[in-house]
């Protein structure tokens, strides 16, 4: 499809945002937009500069015939500090304190903007590491794990306290619960994670 440059820039930006940590070849873009590589390279340079300036992330270029571009979501240090400070203020509310020294967080973990900030901060810290999956124990960690996995473009895996028959065979470990001081069990479906995976 032949698009005006402004339309092409918008579409290209969306494709990069939708496919983080994924190599997209220049040929893909030239074919898609019916444009010369030189024009696509100029477009990418504009997007790269804007992403870095606005704290959206960075665009890495991979040279060679099989090369292309990779969008890596990354939060600016000042943006991360501001988000962390705002979260700290919300968590310091005395009404959040629960018996046993716990803090009520469910409402914060239900807010998309909080998850967005937390997910991007965590993903930024691991953007140069080889991560195959993000793992969490059900259920409180699920929203954050899913957001981080989205930014890293990897699967997220849930470890459960009780296995479901629909998950097939599982691997399990016993641990001492911090909240109840009882020995409990964590179970993971063997099909959800390949042997030797790098897990966050």
Predicted features, each with a name:
Residues 2-200:
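PRPP-associated nucleotide enzymes
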